[in-house]
Structure formats: C-alpha cells, structure tokens
Amino acid sequence: MKYYEMTIAGLKRSLPICPVNDKLSIGAFVIFGDAPLTVACAKELLKIAPTYDYLITAEAKGIPLIHEMARQHGDAKYFLARKGAKLYMTGVFDVAVHSISTAKEQHLYLDTADAEMMKGKRILIVDDVISTGESLHALEKLVEEAGGTICGRMAILAEGDAQGRTDIQYLEKLPLFHPDGTVME
C-alpha cells in the first residue's frame, strides 16, 4: 500500500492511499483513535473559528473532532446529524447525501428537539474532511430547515476542488490521487 505523508496541526501522519474507482484514489484520513491529532486539530480550528452558539457535524468521522472542540471551548452542547433515525428522536429532519467516501446515497437525520435549540442561533458546521461538498450541503440544509444561521464551515482537510472554496476554513490541503498513487494536479 502507498501512503501520503503530511503534517496536520503540527503532527506528522501517513495517510493510506485508497482507490475510490479505477480513475481516482484518495488519502484516507481517519481521526478515530488518534487522540493527539484530535486534540491538536480542535485547538487549531478553534483559533480561526468564528463566533458561534453551537457546533454541528455529520456522523461519524467528525464526532471526535466536534466533541474535542466543544470540550476545549467549554460548550455544554453540540449537535450530531445521524445516518439513521433513532427511536429516541422526537421527530426528524431528513436530507439525502452522497459523498466521495461512500458508495451509495445516505441520509442525514436531525432530532426535532435539537432543531428547536438551533432556531435563531449561530451554527458552525464542522467536519473532518470537505471534498465534494455533498455532506456539507446536507448539513447546511438541516441547519436552515431548523431555523439556525450558518456562521461558518470548517474542516481539518480540504480535498480536491474544496481547496478553492472561499466559504470554508481548513487546516491543510489534501490532494486527490491517480490509481498509481501519484498526486493529481
């Protein structure tokens, strides 16, 4: 397996290069289980974060990051858009999403109780990686339907075309790769 070496929030990491299809590979960024990286990324993102009332992310890879950001910032509450409706939800908002790391359409669900808390509040959208923007768009739709105001969009890494977006903040750029592991220009 080939790897892409990069420094993220001052820490060196090796990302395995994984095929998406016969023409595209990605550097697999997995924050799960990497406590030092999670802490460092949260700290660096908070340095550039706009003023917000609540954070939101999509299940699953943004969870450790948003939790650590909330902990460091002293936030008592953050929101999680789930991949499935849960029995404990009092009602749900539902939007469809298709991202580069998933092979099929998925849905994101937000509990009505959380949506009520978002009304009129400044919501900061956070994720581990922004690539095609589909997951981000789904989160935006959830926040808007809940009556929240999006005050910013942040990620640890901006992948591919996301690097050219002016409406997101991120720590590092992550290129896309050819099937042989070379960087796409």
Report residues per predicted region.
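Active-site-facing substrate-recognition patch
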Residues: 1-52
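Short glycine-rich phosphate-binding loop at a beta-alpha junction
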Residues: 52-59
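Conserved acidic residues
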Residues: 53, 121, 151
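Gly/Ser/Thr-rich loops at beta-strand to alpha-helix junctions
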Residues: 59-65, 132
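Short Gly/Thr/Asp-enriched flexible loops that form oxyanion-binding sites at enzyme active sites
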Residues: 65-73, 140
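A short helix->loop->beta-strand "cap" motif at the edges of active sites that frequently abuts
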Residues: 74-76, 147-148
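Short, glycine/charge-rich flexible loops or terminal/linker lids adjacent to PRPP-binding catalytic cores
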Residues: 75-123
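PRPP-dependent phosphoribosyltransferase catalytic core
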Residues: 137-185
